[in-house]
Amino acid sequence: MAKVYHDTEVSLEALKDKIVTIIGYGSQGRAHALNLRDSGIKVIVAVRPNGESWKRALEEGMTVEKIEDAVQKSDVLMFLIPDTEQPTIYKEKVLPYLRPNQALGFAHGFNIHFSQIVPPPFLDVFMVAPKGPGPLVRDLYVEGKGVPALFAVYQDYTQKCRDIALAYAKGIGATRAGVLETTFKEETETDLFGEQVVLCGGVTALIKAGFETLVEAGYQPEVAYYECLHEMKLIVDLINQGGISFMRKAISDTAKYGDITRGPRIVNEETKKEMRKILNEIQSGQFAKEWILENQVGRPVFNALLKKDEDHLIEKVGKVLREMMPWLKPKK
């Protein structure tokens, strides 16, 4: 089992008298910046001058600088902008101003693991990846709690990088819940696999396939939507709360029997073979190369596939049905 580090085992000492720059002030950036500040760490927010993030950070009492200025003043730099934007920002606004003994931090390992960012050898490089959205990271911190996180050290020039990573995790409240040590390779590959095969790709493909099967068999699209999409949250919430066995205790015996006898016919050995193929594409770097190239040519496949799914019947039906559910606060 992985070693879990808790609040009492970790000190903020490694960040004492250091300046931490948070690059980005979106969902995660704002949460990290505010939590670190409230933990007594000196924080600079680095964003595009006079944009919405700049204005919001100022309104919330943060010290705000242009990225290139903040880099020169800081000891620790945390990248909390989208993965696709990081390499250009790093090359143009960070790399020219780096100095020995600084630390680069990331919340996801993609750009380091797939060499889109290659840091000079005189830096520490670490990762702290909260396992929850930014607003939750902030809200739980304010309540005296925390969101669990992963941490990793990629490059330890000062021989203090591990302490810096753990101190950072403590500063955002993660050690209150517990942090697990991993590697950039493990975090990146498992994160991509989970997104593609289960959490996003797998779930959405399963929902659409079930919906289409019922509609093609003559059932009303509205009923198919309820059975294949809307009720998904009920089951996922139970699994999230207590695991698969806990969920099964909360459903009918009929549902339970159908689950354990029919589920394996849907996700079978052929499905797992395809899962292993996708994992290999991630491990070999094939997916990363494909996604990087897709961005370089303007995302034609990405945009076309998104548009196709946005025009799917399930979206049209869902929009109508969600208007009947005011508690969902339907959004465009």
UniProtKB/Swiss-Prot annotation:
Substrate binds at residue 252. Its cofactor is Mg(2+). It comes from the Bacteria. The keyword Magnesium applies. The active site is at 108. GO terms for cellular component: cytosol. It is an enzyme of class 1 (oxidoreductase). SUPFAM superfamilies: 6-phosphogluconate dehydrogenase C-terminal domain-like, NAD(P)-binding Rossmann-fold domains. Binds 2 magnesium ions per subunit. One of its GO terms (biological process) is L-valine biosynthetic process. Pfam families: KARI_C, KARI_N. Residues 2-182 form the KARI N-terminal Rossmann domain. It catalyses: (2R)-2,3-dihydroxy-3-methylbutanoate + NADP(+) = (2S)-2-acetolactate + NADPH + H(+); (2R,3R)-2,3-dihydroxy-3-methylpentanoate + NADP(+) = (S)-2-ethyl-2-hydroxy-3-oxobutanoate + NADPH + H(+). Mg(2+) 2 binds at residues 191, 227, 231. Its EC number is 1.1.1.86. Pathway: Amino-acid biosynthesis; L-isoleucine biosynthesis; L-isoleucine from 2-oxobutanoate: step 2/4; Amino-acid biosynthesis; L-valine biosynthesis; L-valine from pyruvate: step 2/4. The keyword Magnesium applies. NADP(+) binds at residues 25-28, 48, 53, 83-86, 134. Residues 183-328 form the KARI C-terminal knotted domain. Mg(2+) 1 binds at residues 191, 195. Belongs to the ketol-acid reductoisomerase family. Involved in the biosynthesis of branched-chain amino acids (BCAA). Catalyzes an alkyl-migration followed by a ketol-acid reduction of (S)-2-acetolactate (S2AL) to yield (R)-2,3-dihydroxy-isovalerate. In the isomerase reaction, S2AL is rearranged via a Mg-dependent methyl migration to produce 3-hydroxy-3-methyl-2-ketobutyrate (HMKB). In the reductase reaction, this 2-ketoacid undergoes a metal-dependent reduction by NADPH to yield (R)-2,3-dihydroxy-isovalerate. This is Ketol-acid reductoisomerase (NADP(+)). It comes from Dictyoglomus turgidum (strain DSM 6724 / Z-1310). The gene is ilvC.
